Amino acid sequence: MNTSLISTKSDSTSVHSRPTQEELAAKTATFLQKGLEGAANTRKAYRADIAGLESWLQENGMGVLPIGPAPLAAYLSDLAGHQKWATISRKLAAIRKWHRLRKHPDPGHDEAVRLVMEGIKRSIGTEPQQAPAFEIDSYKQSVRAIPPTPTGLRDRAMLLVCFAGAFRRSELVALDIESVQFTRQGAVLSYRGSKTNQHGHTEQKALFFSPDPETCPVRALQDYLSLLSRTTGPLFIRIRKGEQITDERLSDKQVARVTKQYLGEDYSAHSHRASFVTIAKLNGADDSQIMQQTKHRTRAMIDRYTRVQEVVKHNAAMKLGL
């Protein structure tokens, strides 16, 4: 036997201290909790949903959490009078998860609750309200009118990056300065975590120089960054009265407010994303190119965004001669 092939040294790299049963149980419980809780934005929405339920229970004298199927069915029925299907479904998911996390019986598993939800679905429908898309000419006109103040430079950059990058507002405000890399063609923005990427994988979006310097997302971003006396930290930040620049990260609600301020009350922050898909599609971009920027996992959402525009653009009713 060739004993030289046999190592006489202990392999310290393959040996690790074994956790105790208590440590392993605690670790397992931690991972289970994280798996149940879901993404940060989902947890935030769920907390608000539970707070709303607690207020409703108190106002209607129906006790406190945890609840059973009967009060849950009553709550869902009440919501059906003023909420959309998607909102009701999310609230139900939050309530069910709250009970599961605390090892209470899941009231949403009850047959009566499921039948109530089926009745609500049939009554109010499930079609989500689509964020309106804007016309590119009116959008560019609105952006050009933004004054070159510190707040204006921030808002111009924020709107153009949101549109050209097809960002969700939560993704936009989560960007850091160090996540921006300028290139000869424009810029690459890196970020981690999104609605369709809940495991924190790094994703990237590209911005390109535009012929018009007033509506170029890359130049707008460069102009805004020249205001900030730092190279790390939040990209889009609060600016106080008197144009005092802070290092406080902007909230996603501010993206919605700024959108309405410059584009009009009919538009939401999500209109940038909807408009990106609609305008790119009508200008000849294929679905794979669009999905490269939006990070949609399926073409179903692309079809939803462009449905109304396609009805108008490709329709024989224009050729009736009336």
Where are these regions (language model features)?
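Extended, non-catalytic subsegments within catalytic or DNA/protein-binding/adaptor domains
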Residues: 1-322
